[in-house]
Amino acid sequence: MDALLQTIIFDRSDMKNLTEDNPMSKTSLCFNKRQEELLQLKTSIVNQKKLYCDGNDFYILQPEIRLIEKLPKGNELVRFFKDNMLKKLGYENLSVANIKSLLNELAVDSEIHIENAVFEKNMEYVNFRNGVLDINTGNFTAEVDGYFDYVLDCNYCTVDYQHSFPNSLLKLLKEPMDLENINSVSEKDKSKVILVLEAIGYILADSQQERKAIFFIGPTASGKSTLAKFIASIITPKSMVKKYTLTQMAEGFSSMSAVRAKLNYADELDVSSKKSLQLFKLMVSGGELTLPQKYAEDRDVPIRAKLLFCCNELPDLHNLQAEAIMDRMLLIGFKNSVKKRDSTLAASLYEQRDLIVSMAFDAYMETKKKRKFTDSKFAQDLFKIYSVEQNSNKNFVNDCLKLATDGKIASSKLFDEYNSYCQANGISKPLSRHSLYQEILTKFAGCAEQKKIRDPNTGRSVQGFTGIAFKDDEGESIYGQ
């Protein structure tokens, strides 16, 4: 006899059926009847071939869209099971205790057992509502074996469409905004739209080949968040989209769900710590993240999530390994800041989602062939500025200082001259005092930082450096300030 039938707990309605003249007989009849009903219920659920279990988690199958979705645990699972399965079978009044017993039996039923590998498709396949696209070959088919744990909420356009950009996307991206001539697209606009389409395709695919994090950069009310939310809305179920910061993930907060999602998007890139910086590089590389388990060995989890950031400007990368981060960034600028937001734009994007996403994957497949994203002057200019700022301390030391055995310079004088140097060279974000002083000590082996030196200009005892001098030999500001 099934363990399920040995653990049946009577509903209160069963007790009402007892009579004074033959209570045990009535109880036995109720018990046998409930046994038969629960056996029939279990058989009905198994025969539906929609509920599966890997021994730990339950999954619900939607075969028409090849989606097998992981179900919640605990009381949420009981509630889902009751509302979405038992109600359709006429058992919505089954007690919670009996539902849990039924789930325990189903969890070990070999007929609904499923291995994770069965529904984890190759990264080169993309699941649309109307079929599956192979992004390596461009082949699209409505018939495919196996299942996915997500489906894009759109159809792939299998017929030839005119290669004119969707109006909703042009409205968002044209520079400057020119709604009366929305179809008049400059080469600059065309290049930007293609880059955005490539980025959308890359985000929605599972492939990590390009190893990039996407950055939408621009002022408030420029449309970057609208586009990010549109991309997120294409991914279903919604549990496949997360909004954790790198700091939250680095601290172990929901790390498992974050790395296994399809998309994680946040407002800013927070790489202020070495731990979050390492996590950023690891997640973009598409490797594996080792997560500690409370009562088991640590688990290596493949990283799947694409990272998308919506920023007003690039984060402060000073004092970090900026070069190691920059080559992992795909920057897209949003310059159209509007005074009044267009409340219809999000709906327009969603209405044109079939065309936008189809064009996005066509653009991304071209990117895979040429092994690079479309060049962006916006990104090139931004990286050039960052490179100059990142090396401003080195350039100042090389251009303005020299080794001098008897030389003495006050620390405050050095930093003032460095700031003047940055201002004269158009550097808006000078580095810190610590960065400057460390570069000086690294450059000049005979130089030393002293708590007290005699300032050659004022005669006062101040903190400063010995063994160096300004190249002008005068001790005055080299900019005449």
Residue ranges and their predicted role:
Residues D54-Y91:
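TRNA-binding/sensing appendages of the translation machinery
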Residues D2-N56, N84-Q481:
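Feature primarily recognizes SF3-like P-loop helicase cores of small DNA viruses
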